[in-house]
C-alpha cells in the first residue's frame, strides 16, 4: 500500500466536493497535483501542491483555495491535523490509528510490501555487461553489471515483465586477435619458447589454460596448419572458454541474465538478419547510397571517401548519417546494431534499456536514431551511461593485475571484499557520477560503511526476535499474529516516525523504477537502517522504548511487529540490490 497514492486519491475526492472545482472540472489538470513527504518532517506526514496547481485556472488566491481544501480534508477521520504553509502548500499530519492500520498492512504483506503494478506487465529488455569475450571481466565492467542487474530487479519489483540480456560481441576483429593470442599459448603448451607476447595481442596469463586445453585435444596437429585453417577452430574454442570464464565472474558477483545473444547470430545464413533489417529501413525510406563528408577531428573507423549504403539517421535525431554497407559490400558494425535492435523489437520489446560505459557516450544518438527508424517511434530506447570506477586502498591507487595483463579483474575485487560490498557500493552513487572504491573503507564495520550498516540493521532485527524468545520462553513467535498485535499499542512518536520511514518504501520503488535509478534504493535502505539503529540506541537510555521489555509482554509482541516490518523492507530492498540480508553478523 502506497500511502501517498492513497492520499492523492483522498485529496482529489475532497476537491471534487468543492463547488467551484466541480463547475470548472473540465478546465483543471489533476495530473499536475503532487503528493509527497514534506521537505521538513516537522511540518507533517504528507504535503500537496493542489492549491498551487489549481488556483490560476480557478481564478483564486492559492492560500484562499488551500483553506477551502483544508476544510474538506479535516472531515477525514485519518487526518489528525492539516494546515497551509507558504503561498499555498498543504501539510497533512496523519492519525495514530492510520499509522497503526498501515503498519498492520505492512506486516501482513511482509516481503510483498512495496511491490507495485506501475509497470502493468510491460515488457522491458535490459541489456548490460555485454563485455567482449576476450578475457576475464575487469572492474570497469563491474559497475554496469551491478547497475543493470539491480535495475532489472527493481523494474521486476515494480511490475514490469523484464528480460535480462547479454550481447556477446563475438563477430568482430577482436575475436581473431583472441584466437591468435591463444595460438601462441597453444604453442607454449607444446613446449615452444614463445618469448614476449607480440604487441596487439592479449598478453594475460588467463589464456594459458586455453592453450593447454588445445594441446591436449589436438596435440601438434594445429601447429602444422596454415592460419586460415586453425583460426576458425581456435576462435570457437576461445570464445567458449572466455564465456565460461565470464559467466563464472558474473555468478561470483550474483549477476544473472535470461538471454545470451550472440552477434554471430546476426551474421549467420549470409547475414540474413542484417539484410532483413536494412531492407526494412529501405522500405521505410531511410536508406540511400552516397558519400559522407569527412568528419571534423579524428576519422571514425567506418568512414570512407567513396559511395556507401547509408542510413538517413539525421532524419531521426542523429548528428550524421551512418554507413550500413561499405563500398566493398561488407556490413559495418553499426549495421549489426540495427539488426540487433530490430531483433529485440520483433521479440515484442517496446522498451529497451542499454547499460553502457561512459566511453560509449558517442553511441547514444545513433542508437536512439535506430530505435526511431526501425520502430517508427513505437519503441522507447534508453541508454544509461556508467562513469568510471577508481580503486583505492587506504587512499592510494590500486596497482594493475599480473594475471590479466593490464587491468584489475572483477574476481580479484570480489574475492577480497565480498560480492555484497561490491554490489552495494556500486549502487551507492548515481551511475552517471564517477565512483571511488576504497578496499579499506568497504570492509569497515561502522556507520561509514553503508553495506555493513544496512546489513547489520537486518541482523539486529533478527537478534531482537531471538532476544524476545529468551525473555518469553513459552512464546511461539512463529505463530503470532503480529499484524493484529500492533493495533492500539504502537503509538509512541518515535515508533511512528519509524513506521513513516518504512511507509516511504512503495513510493521510493515507483519513483526509482520510473526514473530508472536503482541507486535510490541503496540510499533509502541506508536511511531506513539509520532510523532503525537510532531507535534501537534510544532504548539503551530509555528502557520504555526498548523493543523487548520482559515486564510487558503485550508491548513487546507489538514491537516485534514493527521490527518485522523493518526487516521485511530491508530484505526486499537488499534483494533488489542483489545483496544478502544476513540473520547474524560476526
Swiss-Prot record:
GO cellular component, one term: cytoplasm
Compartment annotation: Cytoplasm
Record-level GO BP terms: arginyl-tRNA aminoacylation
Keyword S-adenosyl-L-methionine: no
Uppermost EC category: ligase
MF annotations from Gene Ontology: arginine-tRNA ligase activity; ATP binding
EC number: 6.1.1.19
Catalyses which reaction(s): tRNA(Arg) + L-arginine + ATP = L-arginyl-tRNA(Arg) + AMP + diphosphate
Keywords, sorted A to Z: Aminoacyl-tRNA synthetase, ATP-binding, Cytoplasm, Ligase, Nucleotide-binding, Protein biosynthesis
Motif 'HIGH' region: where in chain: 131-141
Top-level lineage group: Bacteria
Gene3D superfamilies in UniProt: Arginyl tRNA synthetase N-terminal domain (3.30.1360.70), HUPs (3.40.50.620), Isoleucyl-tRNA Synthetase, Domain 1 (1.10.730.10)
CDD domains: ArgRS_core (cd00671)
Chief place of localization: cytoplasm
Leader sequence residues: none
Subunit annotation: Monomer.
HAMAP family: Arg_tRNA_synth
PANTHER family listed in its UniProt record: ARGININE--TRNA LIGASE, CYTOPLASMIC, ARGINYL-TRNA SYNTHETASE
Similarity remark: Belongs to the class-I aminoacyl-tRNA synthetase family.
Name by which UniProt lists this protein: Arginine--tRNA ligase
The organism of origin for this protein: Rhizobium rhizogenes (strain K84 / ATCC BAA-868)
Amino acid at each position: 500500500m502506497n500511502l501517498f497514492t492513497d492520499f492523492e486519491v483522498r485529496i482529489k475526492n475532497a476537491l471534487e466536493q468543492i463547488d467551484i472545482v466541480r463547475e470548472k472540472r473540465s478546465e483543471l489538470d489533476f495530473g499536475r497535483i503532487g503528493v509527497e513527504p514534506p521537505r521538513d518532517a516537522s511540518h507533517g506526514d504528507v504535503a500537496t501542491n493542489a492549491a498551487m496547481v489549481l488556483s490560476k485556472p480557478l481564478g483564486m488566491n492559492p492560500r484562499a483555495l488551500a483553506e477551502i481544501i483544508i476544510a474538506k480534508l479535516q472531515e477525514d477521520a485519518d487526518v489528525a491535523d492539516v494546515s497551509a504553509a507558504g503561498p499555498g502548500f498543504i501539510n497533512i499530519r496523519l492519525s495514530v490509528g492510520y499509522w497503526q492500520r498501515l503498519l498492520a498492512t505492512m506486516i501482513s504483506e511482509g516481503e510483498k510490501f512495496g511491490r507495485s503494478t506501475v509497470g502493468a506487465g510491460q515488457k522491458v529488455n535490459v541489456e548490460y555487461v555485454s563485455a567482449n569475450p576476450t578475457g576475464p571481466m575487469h572492474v570497469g565492467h563491474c559497475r554496469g553489471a551491478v547497475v543493470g542487474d539491480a535495475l532489472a530487479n527493481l523494474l521486476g519489483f515494480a511490475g514490469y515483465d523484464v528480460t535480462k540480456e547479454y550481447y556477446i560481441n563475438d563477430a568482430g576483429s577482436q575475436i581473431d586477435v583472441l584466437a591468435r593470442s591463444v595460438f601462441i599459448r597453444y604453442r607454449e603448451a607444446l613446449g615452444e619458447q614463445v618469448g614476449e607476447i607480440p604487441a596487439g595481442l592479449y598478453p594475460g596469463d588467463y589464456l594459458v589454460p586455453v592453450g593447454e586445453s588445445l594441446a591436449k585435444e589436438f596435440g601438434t596437429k594445429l601447429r602444422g596448419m596454415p592460419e586460415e585453417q586453425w583460426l576458425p577452430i581456435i576462435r570457437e574454442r576461445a570464445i567458449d572458454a572466455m564465456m565460461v570464464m565470464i559467466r563464472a565472474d558474473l555468478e561470483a558477483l550474483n549477476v544473472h541474465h535470461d538471454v545470451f545473444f550472440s552477434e554471430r547470430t546476426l551474421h549467420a545464413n549470409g547475414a540474413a538478419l542484417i539484410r532483413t533489417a536494412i531492407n526494412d529501413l529501405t522500405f521505410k525510406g531511410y536508406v540511400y547510397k552516397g558519400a559522407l563528408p569527412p568528419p571534423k577531428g579524428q576519422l571514425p573507423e567506418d568512414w570512407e571517401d567513396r559511395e556507401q549504403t547509408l542510413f538517413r539517421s539525421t532524419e531521426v535525431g542523429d548528428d550524421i548519417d551512418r554507413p550500413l554497407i561499405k563500398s566493398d559490400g561488407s556490413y559495418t558494425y553499426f549495421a549489426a546494431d540495427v539488426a540487433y535492435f530490430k531483433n529485440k523489437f520483433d521479440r515484442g520489446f517496446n522498451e529497451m534499456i542499454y547499460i553502457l560505459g561512459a566511453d560509449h557516450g558517442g553511441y547514444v544518438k545513433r542508437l536512439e536514431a535506430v530505435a526511431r527508424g526501425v520502430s517508427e517511434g513505437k519503441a522507447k530506447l534508453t541508454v544509461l551511461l556508467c562513469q568510471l570506477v577508481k580503486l583505492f586502498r587506504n587512499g592510494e591507487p590500486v596497482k594493475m593485475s599480473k594475471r590479466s595483463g593490464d587491468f584489475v579483474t572483477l574476481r580479484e575485487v570480489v574475492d577480497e571484499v565480498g560480492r555484497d560490498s561490491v554490489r552495494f557500493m556500486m549502487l551507492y552513487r548515481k551511475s552517471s557520477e564517477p565512483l571511488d572504491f576504497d578496499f579499506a573503507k568497504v570492509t569497515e564495520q561502522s556507520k561509514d560503511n553503508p553495506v555493513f550498516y544496512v546489513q547489520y540493521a537486518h541482523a539486529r532485527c533478527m537478534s531482537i526476535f531471538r532476544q524476545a524468545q529468551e525473555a518469553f520462553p513459552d512464546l511461539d513467535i512463529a505463530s503470532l499474529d503480529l499484524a493484529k498485535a500492533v493495533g492500539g499499542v504502537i503509538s509512541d512518536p518515535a515508533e511512528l516516525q519509524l513506521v513513516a520511514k518504512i511507509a516511504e518504501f512503495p513510493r521510493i520503488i515507483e519513483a526509482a523504477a520510473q526514473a530508472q535509478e536503482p541507486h535510490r534504493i541503496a540510499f533509502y535502505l541506508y536511511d531506513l537502517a539509520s532510523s532503525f539503529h537510532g531507535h534501537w540506541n534510544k532504548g539503551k537510555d530509555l528502557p520504555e522504548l526498548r523493543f523487548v521489555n520482559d515486564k510487558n509482554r503485550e508491548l513487546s509482541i507489538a514491537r516485534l511487529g514493527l521490527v518485522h516490518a523493518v526487516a521485511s523492507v530491508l530484505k526486499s530492498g537488499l534483494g533488489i540490490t542483489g545483496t544478502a540480508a544476513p540473520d547474524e553478523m560476526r
